[in-house]
Amino acid sequence: MAKTTIYRSWPNRAALAVDVLVQMVAAAAPPPADGDPLRALRTDLRRIAEAAEGLPGRLLVSLLGEAEHDPEIHEALARELFGPRRQGTVKAIRRAQDSGALRPDVPPYLAGDLLYGPLFYRKFIRHEPVTGAFVDQVFGHILAGLRPRPARRK
């Protein structure tokens, strides 16, 4: 494909890379599905972990590095990738709260950060693999704190 053809669709190579990343993540890890919200969240965490271990993870690392110095890349990642993904996560968390599976007093965005943060920290800060066993362990521990508490007797 000629450079002129590429730049008719994307203003620069960073915009192309963001678009490619969004498409790769959408294919590898579609947003949490309807149905059982806790199962949807766990499935999404596992899919994100798998994507992070492959080419999408490597591309994300590169783009995050560039986003530190390029506000357009930062904005494109927020608008095209992180924003929509977070909306899907928040929707699933709200469904879990509405069903009584999660405490209603925890803000959904905070619950999402608690669930997904350890994966990104482990993969992109510590450079350690994010396995299915790790995802299950994180999910179980975080869920223990997010589940409704039994009423105390007086």
Language-model segments: which ranges?
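Amphipathic alpha-helical packing segments from all-alpha helical-bundle domains
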Residues: E53-S62, E72-D98, P108-Y109
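Hydrophobic/aromatic residues within well-ordered alpha-helical segments
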Residues: R13, V20, M24, A52-P56, ...
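Helix-turn-helix
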Residues: M1-A14, D19
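Short loop-to-helix capping motifs
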Residues: N12, E66-P71
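Tryptophan-centric aromatic hotspots in well-structured domains and transmembrane helices
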Residues: S9-W10, L77, L81, Y116, ...
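Hydrophobic alpha-helical connector segments
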Residues: A29-R58
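Short amphipathic alpha-helical segment with a characteristic S/N-K-E followed by hydrophobic residues
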Residues: N12-A17, A27-A28, L41
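C-terminal peripheral helix-coil segments that are non-catalytic and often amphipathic
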Residues: T43, R47-E50, Q87, K91-D98, ...
